[in-house]
């Protein structure tokens, strides 16, 4: 409710205002601004609303677990589920690999994080925590690119299945398109499955930028292969808890994947890898990708496809802007992240997808 003060200036009596927004709508001078909360602005799938008590609530039927609200909340009021204690317990019980081998599967976007140290020192830090081996999720991306290119050629149209938030969005908002989602596991799950099948006493921890991976790890199709998920922020917390200064450590080597597997971390990288997969396998297919950078771009592409007006035969869907390098669990969201991922890709020893996956055969 508006009142007039001693200076004849209108102000809003907060004790009576119910925040209906009507005054903002009728003010001809736009002197009253109706502001959304940061979490609401961040949520592009409209899963966050205000209840009658003006408290923010999350509609789990709309939430895709992308973590945008977690990242954008300036008060730290929204938290994703953490498996840090589970990981600490797994590290302790592994007894430095004597009880079982604990594998750290690191997402390729790690190349753009921990910019105060060298990547090789981060790998050494993981081993200092008690991990037996560090493996690139990008090798799983090479596996996916190889298989997904064949699947695309067979079916004629496909959407990617690497981003769990994107797949959840299709399931919730475009269920009629679910049959068009690639049947391949994500890179995380693909490489974890290989590890579990070849090393019976292995346990796997995925470390990456993505909060939605925590939900993916609970799916029946993925749960047997992934024991826990950590974000880069949580990994930094583990280093801090051990007073581990990784800048003092020697550099270890990470050399499992190809250039194409590594660039999965940024928008457009998946499509480039699928194109390379088609080329390397001599598959005659005219790839027309629709690269969706962010969930709003995904929505537009899926809407066009649902109306049969999309001029593309492959949708690369990434819920976070920039791709995985824009994930909510990242330590940094800088402009240099894409360049760092591309540099990391160029440094790969394996120059083709076939070179990378040959060690698996």
Regions found by a protein language model. Give the residues of each.
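Short, glycine/acidic-rich beta->alpha junctions
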Residues: 19, 65, 187
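Iron-sulfur cluster-binding cysteine motifs and their immediate structural context
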Residues: 1-11, 22-59, 64, 68-84, ...
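Iron-sulfur-associated redox domains of electron-transfer enzymes in respiratory
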Residues: 74, 79-361
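Short glycine-/small-residue-rich flexible loop motifs, especially phosphate/cofactor-binding loops
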Residues: 14, 40, 70, 123-124, ...
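Ferredoxin-type iron-sulfur electron-transfer modules and their immediate structural context
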Residues: 1-42, 315-318, 338-361
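Charged, low-complexity surface patches
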Residues: 16, 32, 62, 114-117, ...
């Amino acid at each position: 409710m508006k009142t007039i003060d001693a200076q004849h200036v209108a102000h809003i009596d907060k004790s009576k205002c119910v925040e209906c927004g009507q005054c903002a709508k009728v003010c001809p001078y736009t002197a009253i601004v109706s502001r959304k909360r940061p979490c609401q602005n961040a949520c592009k799938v409209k899963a966050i609303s205000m209840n009658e008590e003006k408290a923010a609530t999350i509609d789990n039927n709309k939430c895709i677990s992308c973590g945008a609200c977690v990242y954008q909340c300036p008060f730290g009021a929204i938290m994703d589920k953490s498996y840090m204690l589970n990981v600490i317990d797994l590290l302790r019980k592994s007894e430095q690999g004597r009880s079982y081998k604990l594998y750290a599967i690191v997402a390729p976007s790690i190349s753009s994080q921990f910019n105060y140290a060298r990547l090789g020192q981060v790998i050494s830090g993981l081993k200092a925590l008690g991990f037996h081996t560090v493996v690139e999720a990008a090798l799983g991306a090479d596996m996916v690119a190889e298989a997904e290119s064949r699947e695309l050629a067979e079916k004629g149209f496909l959407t990617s299945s690497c981003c769990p938030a994107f797949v959840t969005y299709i399931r919730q908002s475009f269920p009629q398109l679910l049959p068009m989602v690639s049947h391949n596991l994500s890179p995380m799950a693909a490489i974890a499955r290989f590890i579990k099948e070849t090393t019976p006493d292995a346990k796997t921890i995925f470390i990456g930028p993505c909060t939605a991976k925590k939900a993916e790890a609970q799916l029946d199709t993925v749960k047997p292969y992934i024991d826990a998920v950590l974000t880069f922020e949580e990994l930094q917390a583990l280093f801090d808890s051990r007073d581990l200064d990784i800048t003092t450590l020697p550099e270890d080597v990470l050399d499992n994947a190809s250039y194409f597997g590594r660039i999965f971390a940024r928008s457009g990288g998946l499509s480039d890898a699928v194109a390379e997969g088609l080329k390397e396998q001599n598959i005659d297919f005219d790839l027309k990708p629709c690269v969706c950078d962010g969930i709003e771009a995904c929505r537009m592409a899926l809407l066009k496809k649902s109306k049969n007006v999309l001029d593309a035969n492959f949708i690369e869907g990434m819920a976070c802007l920039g791709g995985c390098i824009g994930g909510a669990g990242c330590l940094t969201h800088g402009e240099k992240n894409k360049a760092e991922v591309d540099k990391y890709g160029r440094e790969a020893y394996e120059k083709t997808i076939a070179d990378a996956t040959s060690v698996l055969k």
